[in-house]
Amino acid sequence: DDYIDFMYAGGGNDRHFTDYMADSVWGRYLVDGDREAALRHLPVMRHIYRLWDEKFDFDKRLYFVEPLLDATEYTVSSIDASGGKDGFRGGDAFRPSINSYMFANARALSRLAAMAGDEAMARDYAARTEAIRGHVLADLWSEKLTHFIDRHQSRKNPHVTYWEPIRNRELVGYLPWMFDLVPDEARYAQAWRHLLDLASLAGKAGMRTVEVNYEYYMRQYRYLGPDPECQWNGPVWPYQTTQVLIGLANLLDHYQSLGPVTRSDYMRLLRQYTALHYQGAGKAKRLDLEEDYHPETGQPIVGLERSHHYFHSGYNDLILTGLVGIRPRADDVLEVNPLLPEAGDPQALAWFRAQDVPYHGRRIAVTWDADGSHYGRGKGLSIEVDGREVARRPTLGRLTTAVESARNATIDRPINRAVQLVRGQFPKGSASSNTDPENVHDAIDGRLWFFPELPNGWSSAPSPAGQWYAIDFGKPVVLGRAELAFFADGKGFAVPRGYRLQAMIGGGWKTIATPRGSPVADGITFLRWPAIRTDKVRLLMTPKGGKAIRLVEFKLFQD
């Protein structure tokens, strides 16, 4: 809800980058069945769709975009449009990506409009959907390359010609399958052989974004000081790998013409992708997904401080809808089709279980146990709804069962009375040291993370002396619990060795909570007390070894 509201009501969708947000709203509806939530922003969704007309070529009937604004700088179209000298900006192109996104968004708007009873809008966007499909198939499919490709949209460019197709395959050519835009025909399915070809898009450690025989494959153009910056002329990108694996899952799930790819290929590529999520070895092995990777070594390319904070994997969705095979539907049916190869295949799995998955207001579990020995629940594939088994088959394959929709569980949204939405207004923070306004504000800004590269929170001065942080609400409020978050790095910052919470009651400070021991480092410490009414609260802290204290967030609630 928060993300959708931000994109459609909070001003978050300025169309700076291409997106398939409307399709995501429909996809969310398929999972939770919440009709009201799905339709809440329909007028705004339609308005934003129409704003994309500025990137629509009314002669060619296709959308175009500068690759940078497709979040894919340094593509074939942008590099070639620069004469091979750059590629960060420029290179506008009719791309499989933006046209697939707009196809999916139009289809979602048609379905949502029909659900809302607006048949005219439903017909309008259904027609738009099919028009885009027709032009993508007619104009972006290359018989020569057997792949969906870009066409240049740049006019008056000395290096490329308007409407000319690009000269090499790119991974983006698989995105039409992500949204079932592609017909179930053998001529299109043959495109998937390039994903398996080491001389094309298949790297030893991941999917190349451009095939290896491109003239400027892996040429590094952009640097931040001595460090290479992000480019899409060959490196593996988790964001697009996710998209391609969703498309491949669609192909394997409900297409008859599969071309050369198999479920074994899917699992191998999924395992390959899984490996990119880890860095280090042995006891030092850790989850750490970065921006992009070298397709032959699997090592990060950019590796800047920001790189560890890219949230573009989509990995959970691949596991639940692909490997486990939960295929969300609008009706009261649960459909499961795990994309596992048969026993004996090197990529086969003998067992898995996905549990407590929310679906149409229920909690479902899907279990696969090839011989029944792992879970002791019987052999085969089974589905449970709210803890009760409702369907089973002895072998891998498609399994469906009726699931009566229920009201989704209410989301608990307690109000943090301490958050300072506007600097300088109540509630106001104050502190014993390091009283820079931004430093003080950071402890009550509502944001919570523990990343050393992105400091957030009030940081005290390093000192053995006691420290305090106080909040003035400007009026009496009722409080009954707190959540405290402290950062520790084993270096300059440590959690306090002692702490207590006080409130202004009857004109003086009175202790309302004195926990034992130290608070949690890089996590949440919960405090409770009998509800009190006060206008001021302060946290008293005793530093550990004279180290600084970073109070990442100080939250206070009524109950």
Language model features by range: what are they?
Residues V31-S97, D124-A131, L137-D150, W192-Q220, ...:
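Active-site acid/base region of carbohydrate-active enzymes
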Residues N416-F450:
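Predominantly extracellular/luminal regions of secreted and cell-surface proteins
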